[in-house]
Amino acid sequence: MKRALRRAIASLAPAAAEAGVRVLLYHAIDGPDAADRMGLRVSREAFREQMQLLHTAGYRVVPLTRMLEAPSFSRDVAITFDDGYRSEMRAAETLKEFGFTATFFVVPRFLDGMQQPAHYWEHWPHMSWDDARALVEGGFEIGAHSMTHPDLTRCDAGRLIEEVAGVKALLERRLEHEIVSFSYPYGRHNRHVRETAGRAGYRLACTSRYGINRPAGACYNVARTEVTAMDRLVDFRRKLQGKYDWLARWQDLR
């Protein structure tokens, strides 16, 4: 759907009425790349502006695990990052300045430096195991984003267990940090994938479907609002308000 049409609809859409946790989804926080047709690289300047807006507008940035608790404040926001890009380390420094927390979903294949890039976004530098440990020591949460970043809905039973349960065991052993959250690669999941995440011991599993979340304990269908390089500050504000949540229906149709 054309960006101009999305913005026009969002400008007229009502704000979300229900209280809950809005989970933001970021990827790389870095300069533009001509190959980045999906807008995965949000600039450092834009990211800082967005964090400043959260601060001045009175949003409360909470850990993703806040969703496991009782019903929340209506302006709760959780911040998440997928793929474990090295540029996310700079984002962590900005978050510290504002006193914000976040969850970083990492992939051991990338942490090991064995990328064998198959997509343009895999060519970007990724953080190391030492970087992941530094995030844990800095008070951030590390979550799992699978072992190698496949489409889990296409994995056979044995590989699915390794990608979902095996990565949890590996991260916990290497980082000495309990892993309770999972992010589905590409946002793709089905009943079998969700059940595997539950049996592996995760309490939360994140999608890339727009929407707001009402805390009610363990959840394997966490909605997230993606922030992209194409978002202006007014777009970011509208996403916080839920004015883009109608896109979830469009995602379902696709």
Give the positions of each predicted feature.
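C-terminal active-site subregion of NodB/CE4 polysaccharide deacetylases
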Residues: M1-T80, Y85-E88, R154-R254
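Alpha-helical scaffolding within the catalytic cores
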Residues: R7-A10, M89-R90, A118-E137, Y210
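Acidic (Asp/Glu)-rich catalytic clusters
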Residues: A16, H55-T56, E93-F100, P125-A144, ...
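Histidine/lysine/aspartate-rich catalytic loop segments that bind and position anionic ligands
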Residues: F110, M127-E162
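A short, conserved beta-to-alpha structural element at the edge of catalytic cores
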Residues: F100-E122
